[in-house]
Amino acid sequence: MAASARIILPAIWLGLIIGISLIEAPLKFTAPGITIPLGLGIGRLVFGVMNWVELVIAVILLWSLLKSGVDRVYRSVACGLIGVLITKVVVIRPLLNQRTDAVLAGVDEGGSSLHLLYIAADGLLIVGLVAALVMAVRRWVLIRPAVAADDR
């Protein structure tokens, strides 16, 4: 399970970020009839659920790392990913929620650079997840022939 988890979990996590952050979020505001308050409300719901799913993936990934031997570089990348995720959920999201509360209450016009922090965090996650996937797939490809040779 641990070797496959090192490939499957980052792939799912990467797909989640690409699908929601890079595709759904920008497109949502181009749909007919979507107002800023409606888009912000949808965004809070979608990103809240996405962050919970990301946290579950991160916990399972961490568990798989603790359960099996993995090289130090992969472990460092995975821990970095978890650190970025925690920062995104614990620091950036609450600030964005305060900001969207103000916009939804009509107190603020919007236009904050806080979304750029969230985008930057997702950018770091994308780079880290691709790196983790490359390392895991390379290791899997190198180990598989050796295992197959042992079976002969």
Regions found by a protein language model. Give the residues of each.
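Interfacial segments of alpha-helical transmembrane regions
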Residues: M1-L14, I60, S64-G83
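Interfacial loop at the N-terminal end of multi-pass membrane proteins
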Residues: M1-V59, P94-D108, S112, D151
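Transmembrane alpha-helical segments in integral membrane proteins
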Residues: P10, A58-V70, V127-I143
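Alpha-helical transmembrane segments
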Residues: I17, S21, L85-I92, I126, ...
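Short amphipathic alpha-helical segments with coiled-coil-like heptad repeat character
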Residues: T35-L38, L104-A105, A120-A132
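Hydrophobic alpha-helical transmembrane segments
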Residues: V49-V56, H115-V130
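Mid-chain, well-packed structural core segment of small domains
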Residues: K67-V107
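Short, highly charged, low-complexity non-transmembrane loops/tails of multi-pass membrane proteins
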Residues: R144-R152
